[in-house]
Swiss-Prot record:
InterPro entries cross-referenced by the UniProt entry: AlphaKG_dependent_hydroxylases (IPR050411), TauD-like_sf (IPR042098), TauD/TfdA-like (IPR003819)
Record-stated family: Belongs to the TfdA dioxygenase family.
Coiled coil: none
Protein name, as recorded: Tyrosine isonitrile desaturase/decarboxylase
């Protein structure tokens, strides 16, 4: 394994990814070349930095560091999202509930290449709250020809009201070419649980399938996505930084016990060139397509 001559300890994570830890006490995360880390993240899809000094609980320091990775995606709240339970949550992201597998930027005009997570404080293992990742790149490589062709010919429509900082309609093939054009990846947002209580509960419609056929398709796909060969659940430790490839991985979250000390910060980094999202368009508050908004 090529570690690109970074001064640290590197080990493989099963079933995919790398765990990078310091070579000496008090080693600062800024001692690791960003270009080398970016290459590792592109090759291994998931890079976990554990045990380094960073000071990233200060949002300004986190923002300054992540700017070295590339152009940052800006949201109405800024570039850093505090992912933590709120007393009156506006959606499931800011609650303690599970989050279904998805890709970030699906309801935006551009899709970021990386998520960079920093763990301010971690829950105990028994409290839940692991972040889940699925290596769709490898899943497709291992799929049968019939399975791949079925997925490649499947188109899914997702719709959600804009009640927080995202919303709209996405019409996307289940299998897409990676933005760099050299491999196939899966773009999928799992259905929410029926008992989900939030207004941003999204709908999932698979074109050409009746209701029972869609349910069977979703169950089959669920079993493939959660196959241990492609599925990794990250147990957070305070101070962890995780860089994940948003093009090749899907990610989600396990539910956690309410009022657990789970606090992550998340930043999105664009690729070069920026990946335009041609599958997205806005919808009006009445849920009809807003024809006055340019489709991207």
């Amino acid at each position: 394994m090529n570690t690109y001559e970074i001064d640290c300890h590197v080990e493989l994570v099963k079933p995919f990814g790398l765990l990078i830890t310091p070579n000496y006490p008090e080693q600062d995360i800024n001692s690791l070349p960003v270009d080398a880390l970016r290459k590792l993240a592109q090759d291994h899809l998931l890079v976990i930095l554990r045990g380094f000094q960073s000071g990233f609980t200060d949002k300004e320091k986190l923002t300054e560091y992540t700017r070295h990775w590339g152009e940052l995606m800006t949201w109405p709240f800024g570039v850093v999202l505090d992912v933590m339970e709120q007393s009156i949550p506006s959606d499931h992201v800011l609650d303690s509930s599970y989050i279904p597998l998805h890709w970030d930027g699906m309801y935006r005009e551009a899709i970021p290449e990386f998520q960079i997570f920093h763990c301010v404080s971690a829950p105990e293992a028994a409290q839940g709250g692991r972040t889940t990742f699925v290596n769709t790149e490898q899943l497709i490589l291992d799929a049968s020809e019939d399975e791949f062709n079925t997925w490649k010919n499947t188109t899914i429509t997702y719709r959600t009201k804009k009640v927080t900082h995202y919303g709209g309609e996405v019409v996307s093939p289940l299998v897409c070419l990676h933005p760099k054009g050299n491999k196939w990846v899966i773009r999928y947002n799992e259905p929410m649980h029926q008992e989900d209580k939030y207004a941003d509960h999204h709908s999932v419609t698979i074109q050409g399938l009746l209701s029972e056929e869609q349910k069977a398709f979703e169950e089959t796909l669920y079993n493939r996505l959660y196959d241990p060969r492609y599925f990794y659940a990250h147990q957070w430790q305070s101070g962890d930084m995780v860089i994940s490839d948003n093009f090749s991985l899907l990610h989600g979250r396990e539910a956690f016990i309410s009022r657990s000390p789970r606090h992550l910060q998340r930043v999105h980094v664009h690729g070069m060139p920026v990946c335009e999202n041609n599958s997205f368009r806005t919808i009006s508050d009445s849920n009809s397509i807003d024809s006055t908004v340019k489709e991207v």
